[in-house]
Amino acid sequence: MQRMYLIPLKDRFMALIPVTILTGFLGSGKTTLLKRLLSEAHGQKIAVIENEFGEENIDNDILVTESKEQIVQMSNGCICCTIREDLRETLQLLAAKKRKNLLEFDRIVIETTGVADPGPVAQTFFMDEEIAETYLIDSIITLVDAKHAPQQLNDRQEARRQVGFADQIFLSKTDLVSKDETEALIHRLKHMNPRAPIKAVHFGEVPLKEVLDLRGFNLNAKLDIDPDFLKEEGDGHDHHDHDHEHGEHCSHPSHQHERGHGHHHHHDDDVKSFVYRSDRPFDPAKLEDFLGAIVNIYGPRMLRYKGVLNMKGTERKVIFQGVHQLMGSDLGPQWAEGETRTSKMVFIGIDLPKDIFLQGLEQSLV
């Protein structure tokens, strides 16, 4: 099991450059959104890292320059940069130029190719100490083409992984499908990833505040902003009878089911999520052993997992999260007086053996 490089929370937002990872299949609207970032007078200094193997360059005329490094200053103060070899090298180059005052930028947006799995891109920011001390992942944003998504999700595991990794999902082209089709798609996406809010967008017109500073990779911030972030909608029933949570915008008819009854889906996606909850504290040593074991065995299939834990021996919440084999934890705020100390964990992955996970977590309690 590999450990994430974790910078102490108090230092984290002061010095680090936030990074947004943008994913989505061909035609989902990534390029439209990036063009807006690079052309609008939004007052932010953003460095956009565009993948050279992307389907469509931001603007071929602008990017054809003599510069070997393919770094171009845009008229609105943003920077566009094309990955030549390796994302890590590109990030180091940008950081070095910023330190020498050769480039000015406040944040980075990385475009992945349509067929990319965002996992390895995200892992770059935890595996390399120099990168982890310079940058902080803010969020992974996935654009989903409402017209073609049902087929893409059926056919391509990369599309399902992009949904599983997302902190925010934007649905494009909803004007090309019926209301029922849109609702069915939202229901399907929520089944795969209950954490990510879903919002319909038109021609990449997304308010910047919904793209930047989401802090999807920092649970502490999210809990401070939204104390209900890890609460299930309107019910306190126990974890064994529920496979996934539903978003507020989901009015699919099959949600009018009796509590505790399973759902029947016409599709069987391999990316699924489940939630574990307990009011008993965890034994730190037992939990570490169990998580280490499952990450070693199932890590490649564990897309995102995170939670707030009640640990024996501390009066503070323990914030835990991981991407594939990389796992990290942090001390969060104090448990409030009179607050029920409930641990809650969300796992999103590919065909994960839910029963093994739940049983192992139960056995890790005090």
Task: Label the model's feature ranges.
Residues 1-13:
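Short, Lys/Arg-enriched N-terminal segments with co-localized hydrophobic residues
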Residues 64-67, 159, 215-219:
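Short, hinge-like loop/turn segments at secondary-structure boundaries
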Residues 15-152:
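Nucleotide-state-sensitive switch-loop elements of NTP-binding domains
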Residues 150-165, 169:
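Flexible active-site lid/hinge loop adjacent to a nucleotide/diphosphate
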Residues 11-13, 168, 177-336, 340, ...:
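C-terminal accessory "lid"/substrate-recognition subdomains
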